[in-house]
Amino acid sequence: NLMSQPRTREILTKTTVDHMAIIKKYTSGRQEKNPALRMKWMMAMKYPITADKRIMEMIPERNEQGQTLWSKTNDAGSDRVMVSSLAVTWWNRNGPTTSTIHYPKVYKTYFEKVERLKHGTFGPVHFRNQVKIRRRVDVNPGHADLSAKEAQDVIMEVVFPNEVGARILTSESQLDNNKREEEELQDCKIAPLMVAYMLERELVRKTRFLPVAGGTSSVYIEVLHLTQGTCWEQMYTPGGEVRNDDVDQSLIIAARNIVRRATVSADPLASLLEMCHSTQIGGIRMVDILRQNPTEEQAVDICKAAMGLRISSSFSFGGFTFKRTSGSSVKKEEEVLTGNLQTLKIRVHEGYEEFTMVGRRATAILRKATRRLIQLIVSGRDEQSIAEAIIVAMVFSQEDCMIKAVRGDLNFVNRANQRLNPMHQLLRHFQKDAKVLFQNWGIELIDNVMGMIGILPDMTPSTEMSLRGVRVSKMGVDEYSSTERVVVSIDRFLRVRDQRGNVLLSPEEVSETQGTEKLTITYSSSMMWEINGPESVLVNTYQWIIRNWETVKIQWSQDPTMLYNKMEFEPFQSLIPKAVRGQYSGFVRTLFQQMRDVLGTFDTVQIIKLLPFTAAPPEQSRMQFSSLTVNVRGSGMRILVRGNSPVFNYNKATKRLTVLGKDAGALTEDPDEGTAGVESAVLRGFLILGKEDKRYGPALSINELSNLAKGEKANVLIGQGDVVLVMKRKRDSSIL
């Protein structure tokens, strides 16, 4: 009894309550409070471990030194055996071995991490103040970006294939991953639960909200503890890249290119969707990546909105992500006069609001009232980045002194030559030159506040004065941490609005930064051919004609107008000098009409070569051309109407077409009896002889032709109800 011993009696009766809390802490609950101590104390005992009875058959009672490895006495309250810690040593040295073949496969992410670190290079350590801001980052390099639910199904399928519960793997990525894992993990002896944990690392993106200064891709985040402290940073170059970072990077580039291209087309939204659906990134459909990838970037979010996916509720202005943290406002249209007396119609936000602003190189906290900046606290990597943030905040505040600081007219246009909206007009104006804005803003005396200093109109720091309401802080402003996604709508011009009608994103917000994608981006849409310049347009146009020759051929003879209006010929028009587009088009269309009228002069090579020139609205003129000019390689190059040129070269011997020296595909042409180079085949393996000839019976459908013998003639119905007489060729051959 504790009360009978004087010392314990004293503790239990006289201890103050706060000490009682400590006693309680160490004596209550099932959670071990001091694991290290507990471990030392346990290991000091003779038999600290219990094991299943089968251990007695697998391990001798004594080791080579004669020390006892297990005791016959049962563990109190169970039928397990008491085992010495020496038994573990014996097992490690003499126990059964197992195949290690599956370890690198199951622990793939760890093995890969070791390789990346082995080949990584660590540079010097710099001591300086680190402006870290919390960002949502990917902490798991080398994952496949499946959703948690999708991954769970794959894991169950691989690890417990015979379990009950129907799981249907639907998405392409699920099936690919499942097949690969099942092949790699045949006869695997590693505990299923371990395999499941490791598979999860391979399949799912794990994000954490961490303080970061510097690189945010997952191969940097995995060494965050080695590369940045509170007052130091260690330079580091990863020893390898991982696909998930490459996907994120390439997705942003593809999305930016697509949004930029869509903006200038007649129907931006329809074009954007067409391009998203026909683009592949690293061999995976872009729309599949968009559905799974949580990357938040303006262009990516516009593409997601177009697909009807939810996106973050923050909005973008001047390349900064704004998140309202308190307050509210109503919008009213107001007319204001610039310093140049130009009238602008702006939507004024009336009311007090607070925002966080997060950009790539600077962050800020902004407090504003109606057309008035109350306070702006900025932090950034350098003077330039801080200035960018200040300009954006000043424009966003809609203050009168900002509008009055405009010198000259505002007439900025977007890629499609449409005027920008007034807020973006102002932004572009001051991004070009903000001197007057800063000069007119006004300055004030400042109090000495820890961690804050002033900034003067010339962007130099000061401890006495500062731009009115503006301060520079040593501390960064954290990115908005919530992963909440909202339903949005998108209009024809790619403006994305939330359900209250606030504009969250527009093409003006898409960065003009050009980068080189890490993964191959394949834009199948003809709208993207011009992304790699005029040469690519030329090659792609001709490749497209050759790939689709079967249908092009029939349209050429049946419904040329529809063929001439194909969007695939649109990019090509930019290569033809403006002044002659209409003349060329009229000339080639007339030439083609003559070919159709005079049966038997169907020249495949010539049709392919001249077809792209028919897309412009034709001008009727008597002009004849022996060559047509296209602007490539910085100058006009000629395509000969009859014959080869460096631009368009058809080699009869190899039957291959080269465009500007690049292979554009094979033309398996078949110049028939006698008329070399003259083609009159519209149907593969048949020669068109002329108009319908009743002597050869009723018109057959194209499918019925297969029964004809070589050299036999028949009438056949093609295209829009026209009937022509054809003959089955005497040699087996095909045109293309």
Curated annotation (Swiss-Prot):
GO terms for biological process: 7-methylguanosine mRNA capping; cap snatching; DNA-templated transcription; symbiont-mediated suppression of host cytoplasmic pattern recognition receptor signaling pathway via inhibition of MAVS activity; symbiont-mediated suppression of host gene expression; symbiont-mediated suppression of host mRNA transcription via inhibition of RNA polymerase II activity. Signal peptide: none annotated. The keyword Cell membrane does not apply. A motif (Nuclear localization signal) lies at residues 728-731. It comes from the Viruses. Disulfide bonds: none annotated. One of its GO terms (molecular function) is RNA binding. It holds the Pfam family Flu_PB2_6th. Keywords: Cap snatching, Eukaryotic host gene expression shutoff by virus, Eukaryotic host transcription shutoff by virus, Host gene expression shutoff by virus, Host mitochondrion, Host nucleus, Host-virus interaction, Inhibition of host innate immune response by virus, Inhibition of host MAVS by virus, Inhibition of host RLR pathway by virus, Inhibition of host RNA polymerase II by virus, mRNA capping, mRNA processing, Viral immunoevasion, Viral transcription, Virion. SUPFAM superfamilies: PB2 C-terminal domain-like. The keyword Cell division does not apply. Plays an essential role in transcription initiation and cap-stealing mechanism, in which cellular capped pre-mRNAs are used to generate primers for viral transcription. Binds the cap of the target pre-RNA which is subsequently cleaved after 10-13 nucleotides by PA. Plays a role in the initiation of the viral genome replication and modulates the activity of the ribonucleoprotein (RNP) complex. In addition, participates in the inhibition of type I interferon induction through interaction with the host mitochondrial antiviral signaling protein MAVS. Influenza RNA polymerase is composed of three subunits: PB1, PB2 and PA. Interacts (via N-terminus) with PB1 (via C-terminus). Interacts with nucleoprotein NP (via N-terminus). Interacts (via N-terminus) with host MAVS (via N-terminus); this interaction inhibits host innate immune response. Belongs to the influenza viruses PB2 family. This is Polymerase basic protein 2. It comes from Influenza A virus (strain A/Guinea fowl/Hong Kong/38/2002 H5N1 genotype X0). The gene is PB2.
